[in-house]
Curated annotation (Swiss-Prot):
This is Lipoyl synthase 1, mitochondrial. Its main location: mitochondrion. CDD domains: Radical_SAM. Keywords: 4Fe-4S, Iron, Iron-sulfur, Metal-binding, Mitochondrion, S-adenosyl-L-methionine, Transferase. GO terms for cellular component: mitochondrion. Residues 122-341 form the Radical SAM core domain.
Amino acid sequence: MFGMLRALKTHVEAPIVVATRAASTNAEKLEEIRERLAKGPNFQDFVQNPDNSRSEWENYEGKLRREKGEEQRLRLPPWLKTTIPVGKNYAKIKAQMRELKLSTVCEEARCPNIGECWGGGEHGTQTATIMLMGDTCTRGCRFCSVKTARKPPPLDVNEPVNTATAIASWGLDYIVLTSVDRDDLPDGGSKHIAETVREIKARNSNIFVECLVPDFRGNLECVETIANSGLDVYAHNIETVEKLTPYVRDRRAHYRQTLQVLTEAKRFNPNLITKSSIMLGLGETDEEIESTLKDLRTAGVDCVTLGQYMQPTNKHLKVIEYVTPEKFKHWEERGNELGFLYTASGPLVRSSYKAGEFFITSILENRKKRQNATELSKE
């Protein structure tokens, strides 16, 4: 009997000893891996190589344009590689977005500049772009990664107050409100957007508010509602040149309709700053870009941004061309020559990218120019 118990004890203890040794070995291996990871390159090194200097940009010999009929995607050039988002302010904003069930176009549209805008950069203006009326759009533009549906969920009646409450706690200098298209609503959601603006201004009258809004299918009553809501900047994107509009944008969006919306917004409120944005790299020509810029100026648009189109998923339009930083610099200079209050042009520039910094810097520069001109006239 005792012999059987000793044998059983031996059989029980043996697996325990083996398991303990295995656990010890695994722990040592895990510690070794952690040490190697700590000393080696991290994930951010793979996302952005610190050696990607301007000389590397200039010496880049990769293919920048896809030929007609060519299916293979272009390789991403070095000037389009960005850092992953980090920082306390970034984490704070993201956490509150989740808590208050708010959406941002920064996340939904997979913007590459989210960390820089939310964090404010080293000396920059903190900017966030909140997407109102949910995360589902009634339109299906071929460049956009936002979800689509014919009848999205109903509006959240608490969203205007929740949005204003969050913004007041962040201490932002500049807020951009954008929205999905809501063709399923009689007013396209214009009253909802206007109410949000008023709630924000009630809590902080000094914050700059920009609204990047839909075309409301050309309904000028909706445009007037937004224009007189108390916002500072009325933005509506033309997106691309006239020839490519039917191919790039939803069939309900029209090039001339966009120009009319921008023109009428200024008429309803002459004190507004109006703004629009153009994506490059979809196959447009220089002549077509020039024509679009002139059309925007004729419509009274004050500010324009130009940025590189980047394909969000395999289901979206392919990039035809990666435009060089030098070419973007050319369009910035050309925009200034045409009389825009400011032109933000660069590969990673988006409609609301560092909107506050570009806007405020431009305003200050223009004030300084006027001051210098006044001093010269007195001499």
